[in-house]
Swiss-Prot record:
It catalyses: a 6-(N-acetyl-alpha-D-glucosaminyl)-1-(1,2-diacyl-sn-glycero-3-phospho)-1D-myo-inositol + H2O = a 6-(alpha-D-glucosaminyl)-1-(1,2-diacyl-sn-glycero-3-phospho)-1D-myo-inositol + acetate. GO terms for cellular component: cytoplasm; endoplasmic reticulum; endoplasmic reticulum membrane. One of its GO terms (molecular function) is N-acetylglucosaminylphosphatidylinositol deacetylase activity. GO terms for biological process: GPI anchor biosynthetic process. Belongs to the PIGL family. It is found in: Endoplasmic reticulum membrane. Residues 39-304 are cytoplasmic. Keywords: Endoplasmic reticulum, GPI-anchor biosynthesis, Hydrolase, Membrane, Transmembrane, Transmembrane helix. Its EC number is 3.5.1.89. Coiled coil: none annotated. This is N-acetylglucosaminyl-phosphatidylinositol de-N-acetylase.
Amino acid sequence: MKMLRRTKVNFSKLLYKITKLAIVLTILYIYFTPKIVSRNNASLQHIFPHKYGDYEINLVIAHPDDEVMFFSPIISQLNSYFPRTVPFNIICLSKGNAEGLGETRVRELNESAALLLHNERAVSVQVMDFQDGMDEIWDIDSITSSLSQKIDIKNHNLNQIIVTFDSYGVSNHINHKSCYAAVKKLVDDYAQPKTKRNEQPPHVTALYLRSYKNNIVLKYNSFIWEILKILYDLISPFRRIIQALPPNTAAEKDKLSLMNTHAQYVLAFATMLNAHESQVVWFRYGWWIFSRFVFVNEFDVYTY
């Protein structure tokens, strides 16, 4: 009995300490909102210095709810950074019909887009009819052909931004990986032959979401790592020296890191709960607490 009581007391103390730490980190997260906004704008300015040019944003996903489960940070930041004249296209390769809820999930995707992109921007949601499922192998040539009809990649007067998964697809989901394969084929086919590509300045930017395949700690550390990075920037005795140095563009040009502010995270979570009601099951709450993807997106950047 004494051992049981002692265990309960120790567990209560541990829970109390964890709760206090969570509160402190959340307060810091809110407090650092201006810093987060500044970092996001600097990152986007580095990749897209001429934001008032002719742009079109394209998000290629596999299932309805991918946009909010994995891509809410970049959706929110691109929506804030670019003027409202820049259209935003969400291209979903399936209806998410594995459980017979296809039409419901298409409606939910449209509701989600309306909540996440809540301004006067032109938003297009286009849903294809590939059958989703872990055992469903999609024809990449067919997807690429469909994407080429929806993304005007050959128009050199229009800067195309294409956002999708990387080759691992966050969770190694075969449908997510197909998004990457199709987008990569689309831009690679466009880029050939090289002589043709060199005739025109780059106008296509492909952003592939980093999956952290071999780093499960980073993948599920919520927003903690980013808060620690901000704190380090503030307290490091060498920060003024480092900031005085010219940026290492060779190292940074191929990477884009964006973070939701606390308010944007709350909006994304509310979007999941209200728009994607059919997908709200108990384990999703754990995702919204621990997953890095609902707080931070990091991308490998390629220009063509």
